[in-house]
A protein has these predicted regions:
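Double-stranded beta-helix
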Residues: 3-34
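Bacterial N-terminal signal peptides that target proteins for export
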Residues: 41-56
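Bacterial N-terminal signal peptides
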Residues: 55-63
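Noncatalytic scaffold domains of N-terminal-nucleophile
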Residues: 68-88, 92, 100-267, 272-274, ...
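Active-site rim segments in enzyme catalytic domains, especially the processed small/beta chain
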Residues: 113-117, 124-139, 291-296, 444-507, ...
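Short, small/polar residue-rich loop motifs at catalytic or cofactor-binding pockets
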Residues: 307, 430-433, 497-499
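Internal maturation/activation junctions in enzymes
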Residues: 342-451
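Extended C-terminal subregions enriched in glycine
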Residues: 492-494, 527, 536-583
Length: 613
C-alpha cells in the first residue's frame, strides 16, 4: 500500500467539525478525515482539458523575471510560489482547467529546476489539501526516512562526541529516503484531473531549452561555492568552465534532469524507487567520497507516503489546521497562538515592543516543549493532545511576564506527560526549503512546504537533481545525561521538522486562508506572525507577510535586519533579552479567500510571485 492507516486526529478547543474513519473509494486503506461545518458546499467539477500549448508556455517562462509586488486579487483561481517561473506553470495549468493538485505537480517539478537549492524530488514534503467537493482536509507526509542500516551514532565521532554540523551534512551520510515524488504521484492519482505526463512536460522542455539563473540562485551558489565544489557532478552544473560560480542571467540547461523526468512521465515513480534512477541514487550516496551514506535499494523500495490527520486548533473565531508529527509546526504554532490568546493583543501594535516581547516569550516557551516532546510519533509516544490542551496553555501563558524576561523557562508537563523520561533536544535546523499555496476554480486548496533541508542539501547530485541532507534534522546525540532524546535517529524514522503548511477556516467552516514558509526552525515564528497579522489585526495577507520577522527559538531573540524591528533592540535588551539583529529571510506565500474573491501575497524577501484570474 502507498498509504497507511493514520492515527487518531488531533482536534482541540471548540472546533466545529466532524471526525470520521472511513474506507477511501480510491484505494484500499483507512483514512481519518476532518470536515469543517459548512453553510455552503462548493462542487468540484471534473473538466476535460486540451493539451497544454507548450511552445507558448516555454516562451513565456523564459521571459519572466522576479518583480516585487503588492497583494494580488483574483476571482477564480490563484497560485503563489517562491519563483516566478514556477508560478507561471501553476497558473497555466489552472487556466486550462486543471485543479490544485495538478498545479502542485507542475509547480514542484519546476521549482526543482529553477530553485534547486531549496527543494526537489531528491527531498521530502508535507502537503495540506482541502477537497472542496468532499469538504475534507487531509495532510500527507512525504518526509524522508532514515535508512534501515542507520544507527543512532551516525553523527557521533569515535570519541562519542557529535561531529560538527556541516561535517555531517556534506556527502552521503546525511541522505534520507526521498519522499517528494511519491507524494506527488499518490495525490495526483487520487485527486488529479489532467494527465500526469502533461504536467511534467513544461519542466522537461525548459530543462532542455535552458532557463535564466535568478539573482537568488546565483547568490546561493556563490555563498556555498566551497562545499558545492566537493563533488564533480555538482561542480560541473553550478560552475562555469573556469571554476567561477554561475552568474545571474546565465542560460542554464539541465539535460540530465530532462531525461530523468521523461522516465518519470512515462513510468511514474517506478524507476525512481525500483529502477535505474534508484540504482544511481544509491550508488551516489554509498560512493560519496569522504562521507559515504547508508541509503540502500531496500530503503527506496519500502518507502511510502502516509496520510495523517491534520492537527487543528482554534484561534478567535477561526480554526487553524496544520501538519502533525513528525512536523512540529502545527503543534508549536498552536501553542504560541494559544498562549498569546490570553493577552489583550487588540490593544497592542504588531510592531511595538510589548507585543514583540510577548511573541518572543511565547515562541521560547513553545520551543521548550518542542525540544523535549516532539518527534516522529510512530516511534515516540507523544502527549500530542496535551500539548494543545487549552487549560495547559493558559497555565503556560502565566509564565510570561509582560514587563521583563521570565527566568528559568523550561518544558512543561502537559496532560498525559507525567511519566515521560526524555532529554531536551536543541538540534540545528538551518534556513532553506520552499513553500507554495494554490486555490483552484472549484475551491480546492493546496498548502505545501517542500525541502532538501539545507541549501543544496547534501551537495550530492545525480541525474540532474540534488539529494537531501535530511538526516541532520535528527539530534546528533541519541541521548543526553543518560536519557533518550525523542528526536534521536532510528532506522526508518522520519526526522522532526518545522515545516508548517497551514489552512485556516472561518466560523462557518469555510476555507479562509492557505499559508506557509521556508526558513528552517524559524518557519514556526514566521508563520505564526503572519497568522496573527491576518486573524488578529485583520491585515491584508501581503501586509502580514511584510511584517518584520522576530524569532526566539532558543536563548537569543532575533530581530530582522533592515526593518523597523531593528529599532526594538534597546527596548528588548532593557527587558532582559539577549538580542541579535540579523537577516531573517522568510519565504512566505499565502492566499486569503474572501466572499468577493482571492487575495494573494508573496514574500518580498525572496523571489515569490502571485498569479491568478
Amino acid at each position: 500500500m502507498l498509504l497507511v492507516e493514520p492515527k487518531e486526529v488531533v482536534n482541540i478547543g471548540d472546533a466545529e467539525g466532524e471526525l470520521t474513519a472511513e474506507n477511501d473509494d480510491r484505494g484500499n486503506y483507512q483514512r481519518s478525515v476532518f470536515r469543517p461545518i459548512l453553510q455552503q458546499n462548493t462542487n468540484r467539477g471534473i473538466m476535460l482539458i486540451n493539451r497544454l500549448l507548450l511552445s507558448s508556455i516555454i516562451a513565456s517562462l523564459m521571459a519572466i523575471s522576479a518583480i516585487a509586488q503588492d497583494s494580488k486579487k483574483a476571482s477564480k483561481f490563484m497560485v503563489a510560489t517562491a519563483n516566478p517561473v514556477a508560478s507561471k506553470v501553476g497558473y497555466d495549468i489552472l487556466k486550462r482547467g486543471g485543479n490544485a493538485i495538478d498545479a502542485m505537480v507542475g509547480v514542484q517539478l519546476m521549482l526543482n529546476l529553477v530553485e534547486p537549492q531549496s527543494s526537489g524530488i531528491g527531498g521530502g514534503a508535507f502537503l495540506l489539501f482541502y477537497d472542496a467537493e468532499r469538504n475534507e482536509v487531509s495532510s500527507f507526509d512525504g518526509r524522508e526516512t532514515a535508512p534501515l542500516k542507520a544507527k543512532g551514532d551516525l553523527f557521533l565521532k569515535e570519541d562519542g562526541s557529535p561531529m560538527k554540523f556541516f561535517d555531517g551534512v556534506v556527502g552521503g551520510r546525511s541522505v534520507g529516503t526521498p519522499g517528494t515524488l511519491k507524494l506527488l504521484e499518490v495525490t495526483h492519482k487520487n485527486y488529479g484531473s489532467l494527465p500526469w505526463e502533461e504536467l511534467i512536460e513544461p519542466t522537461i522542455q525548459l530543462a532542455e531549452k535552458g532557463f535564466r539563473v535568478s539573482k537568488r540562485m546565483a547568490s546561493s551558489v556563490e555563498q556555498d561555492a566551497e562545499r558545492l565544489k566537493t563533488f564533480p557532478a555538482t561542480k560541473s552544473y553550478f560552475f562555469l568552465n573556469d571554476g567561477t560560480p554561475i552568474p545571474e542571467g546565465t542560460l542554464l540547461r539541465n539535460p540530465d534532469f530532462a531525461q530523468t523526468l521523461r522516465l518519470i512521465a512515462a513510468q511514474g515513480s517506478e524507476p525512481f524507487y525500483y529502477g535505474e534512477i534508484a540504482r544511481d541514487i544509491v550508488r551516489t550516496v554509498q560512493e560519496a567520497k569522504g562521507n559515504p551514506g547508508k541509503l540502500s535499494l531496500a530503503d527506496l523500495r519500502n518507502y511510502w507516503v502516509i496520510e495523517r490527520p491534520p492537527v487543528c486548533h482554534d484561534y478567535k473565531q477561526f480554526q487553524v489546521c496544520g501538519m502533525g508529527p513528525p512536523s512540529s509546526g502545527a503543534l508549536t504554532i498552536g501553542q504560541m497562538l494559544g498562549m498569546l490568546s490570553h493577552f489583550e493583543l487588540d490593544k497592542l501594535s504588531p510592531t511595538g515592543p510589548t507585543f514583540s516581547h510577548l511573541f518572543a516569550e511565547a515562541n521560547l516557551l513553545a520551543f521548550k516543549d518542542r525540544g523535549l516532546y516532539m518527534a516522529d510519533s510512530d516511534y515516540v509516544d507523544m502527549p500530542t493532545k496535551g500539548l494543545l490542551n487549552p487549560q495547559y496553555l493558559k497555565m503556560r501563558s502565566k509564565l510570561i511576564n509582560s514587563s521583563k524576561v521570565s527566568d528559568g523557562m523550561s518544558p512543561g508537563v502537559p496532560p498525559t506527560a507525567s511519566n515521560y523520561q526524555l532529554s531536551p533536544d536543541a538540534s540545528m535546523e538551518l534556513p532553506s526549503t520552499s513553500h507554495f499555496a494554490i486555490v483552484d476554480a472549484q475551491g480546492n486548496a493546496v498548502s505545501m512546504t517542500t525541502t532538501i533541508e539545507n541549501g543544496f542539501g547534501s551537495r550530492l547530485m545525480t541525474r540532474g537533481f540534488l539529494l537531501n541532507n535530511e538526516l541532520t534534522d535528527f539530534s546528533f546525540r541519541p541521548e543526553q545525561d543518560g536519557q533518550l532524546i525523542a528526536n534521536r535517529l532510528e532506522p526508518g524514522k522520519r526526522p522532526r521538522s518545522s515545516m508548517s503548511p497551514t489552512l485556516v477556516f472561518n466560523s462557518s467552516g469555510q476555507l479562509h486562508m492557505a499559508v506557509g514558509s521556508p526558513g528552517g526552525s524559524r518557519i514556526i515564528p514566521y508563520v505564526a506572525k503572519t497568522l496573527l497579522g491576518v486573524l488578529q489585526w485583520n491585515m491584508d495577507i501581503q501586509e502580514a507577510i511584510n511584517l518584520p520577522n522576530i524569532a526566539k527559538n532558543f536563548s537569543t531573540m532575533d530581530l530582522e535586519a533592515g526593518t523597523s524591528a531593528e529599532q526594538l533592540k534597546v527596548d528588548m535588551e532593557q527587558l532582559g533579552h539577549k538580542v541579535s539583529v540579523r537577516p531573517l529571510t522568510s519565504g512566505l506565500q499565502g492566499i486569503v479567500i474572501t466572499p468577493t474573491g482571492l487575495i494573494g501575497g508573496a514574500d518580498p524577501r525572496r523571489e515569490g510571485l502571485v498569479l491568478g484570474d
